[in-house]
């Protein structure tokens, strides 16, 4: 049974869904995330396996001394990392292609050409043209300049802009280009010729913008955008209120597809000085008592607020597996379980999805705050020691406090309580998601939403009145 509050929240959520699912942009976003999912699953599995099993500082690599009995372990890890670069680190460009492609269908444009021009524009904007156009420069720029799932907003923005620019240029070109009198006269060649002008304009503008971005010294358009919203160094004080606020800002950026200032893979970078002093005192005294900095970003956020990645994603994955009544949700949850245990949350971001999903935005923002509060209280009152020793970036988040305090059981218990607190935050929202799904099945939602819930979208995408080629793909 659902409580009155859950029914009220479900009604509000369904109202929001009713509004946004009529928007072409939202339809294209959902289709884009669905099409990205297989690549994200493969890339995340490769990352999780390579970095936890075949890399020198990996969790399983260190525990089972894999390098001693498998000399080729690091070579295997490098190959798997390279394969993951082709999938995960190219998500921005794939997102630009797919988003532009689906938008083009909705606008009755040539979806294949529009998708390709958007992807090329995204690649051009990520390359530093002033550094010299070489194979090495282009390759490193595309794989290392924030092209992953966590910056998918950049790809969507480029895809949207490229589509609208193509649409406008195509309208201008239609005033002087000869259009076929009948649809039978339209061929691949004529459609390609009509696309020369809009494609040229979009790519030329992308090159010009890339040159301007290169002058700023930033790593592509994604780097410039992240730099423009970055917090100043002085903002990272170690008061618990500041930690909470920066965590909230970080996760707000995450749900719209941008990297925030915090990451489980950047431990000790925000508070490296404080962590170093804590470690020095602990090594000198042989005790974790009377440390100079008990509350820092590392001892609170990394340890208690980022289990499974930002947003306490591990708690969401476990809650989905246990409580969701939607088969697709549970399947994605099982796929996401191992990578999330190793702190890779890309599958959850794209598959549930968390990105741009009204139902999961609120708990994604609240769960880390609640979990950090649970961890901060015993830490503040001296009931548990702070984490001092280096831990595995790819280890299960709920073991970080235990390992980082050299096996303190009170720290482990606090981690478990923090995890359960995050889990409880997600539970009512999963129940609301179940209720919305049940109403979809019983036909209480409009037909358009029922079709959208299937994530196929074929019926939602209007067909061309007289297509020259009777296929959904154009090239």
Task: Identify the role of each PLM range.
Residues 58-63, 270-282, 372-396:
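Juxtamembrane non-transmembrane "cap" segments at the membrane-aqueous interface
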Residues 1-41, 46, 52-55, 71-72, ...:
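Signature of multi-pass transmembrane helix bundles
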Residues 207-226, 231-322:
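Membrane-embedded translocation segments of transport machinery
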Residues 133-140, 240, 283-286, 352-356, ...:
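A cytosolic-side transmembrane-helix exit/cap motif
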Residues 11, 15, 81-86, 330-337, ...:
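Short, amphipathic, aromatic/basic-enriched membrane-interface segments that mark the entry/exit
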Residues 94-99, 246-250, 313-317, 342-350:
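Hydrophobic, membrane-inserted alpha-helices
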Residues 58-82, 86-98, 140, 240, ...:
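Interfacial loop/helix-cap signal at membrane boundaries in integral membrane proteins
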Residues 103-107, 297-304, 316-387, 402-415:
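Hydrophobic alpha-helical bundle architecture
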């Amino acid at each position: 049974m659902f409580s009155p509050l859950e029914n009220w929240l479900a009604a509000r959520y369904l109202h929001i869904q009713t509004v946004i699912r009529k928007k072409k942009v939202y339809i294209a976003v959902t289709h884009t995330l669905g099409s990205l999912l297989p690549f994200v699953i493969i890339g995340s599995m490769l990352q999780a396996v390579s970095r936890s099993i075949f890399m020198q500082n990996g969790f399983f690599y260190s525990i089972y001394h894999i390098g001693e009995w498998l000399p080729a372990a690091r070579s295997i890890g490098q190959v798997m990392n390279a394969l993951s670069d082709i999938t995960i680190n190219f998500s921005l460009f794939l997102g630009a292609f797919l988003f532009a492609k689906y938008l083009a269908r909705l606008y009755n444009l040539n979806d294949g050409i529009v998708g390709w021009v958007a992807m090329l524009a995204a690649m051009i904007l990520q390359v530093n043209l002033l550094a010299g156009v070489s194979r090495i420069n282009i390759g490193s720029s595309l794989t290392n300049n924030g092209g992953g799932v966590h910056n998918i907003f950049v790809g969507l923005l480029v895809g949207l802009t490229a589509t609208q620019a193509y649409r406008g240029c195509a309208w201008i070109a239609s005033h002087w280009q000869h259009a076929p009198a009948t649809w039978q006269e339209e061929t691949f060649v004529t459609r390609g010729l009509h696309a020369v002008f809009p494609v040229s304009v979009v790519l030329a503008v992308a090159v010009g913008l890339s040159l301007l971005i290169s002058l700023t010294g930033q790593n592509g358009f994604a780097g410039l955008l992240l730099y423009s919203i970055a917090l100043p160094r002085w903002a990272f004080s170690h008061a618990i209120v500041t930690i909470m606020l920066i965590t909230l800002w970080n996760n707000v950026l995450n749900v719209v597809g941008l990297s925030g200032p915090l990451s489980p893979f950047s431990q000790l970078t925000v508070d490296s000085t404080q962590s170093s002093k804590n470690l020095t005192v602990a090594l000198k005294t042989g005790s974790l008592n009377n440390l100079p900095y008990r509350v820092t970003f590392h001892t609170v956020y990394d340890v208690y607020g980022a289990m499974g990645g930002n947003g306490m994603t591990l708690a969401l994955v476990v809650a989905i597996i246990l409580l969701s009544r939607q088969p697709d949700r549970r399947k994605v949850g099982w796929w996401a379980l191992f990578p999330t245990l190793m702190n890779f949350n890309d599958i959850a971001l794209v598959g549930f999805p968390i990105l741009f999903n009204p139902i999961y935005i609120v708990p994604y923002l609240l769960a880390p705050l609640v979990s950090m509060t649970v961890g901060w209280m015993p830490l503040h009152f001296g009931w548990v020691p702070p984490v001092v020793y280096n831990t595995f970036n790819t280890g299960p988040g709920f073991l970080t406090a235990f390992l980082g305090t050299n096996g303190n059981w009170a720290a482990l218990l606090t981690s478990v309580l923090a995890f359960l607190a995050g889990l409880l935050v997600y539970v009512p929202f999963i129940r609301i998601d179940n209720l919305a799904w049940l109403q979809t099945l019983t036909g209480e939602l409009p037909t358009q939403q029922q079709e959208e819930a299937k994530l196929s979208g074929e019926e939602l995408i209007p067909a061309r009145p007289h297509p020259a080629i009777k296929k959904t793909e154009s090239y």
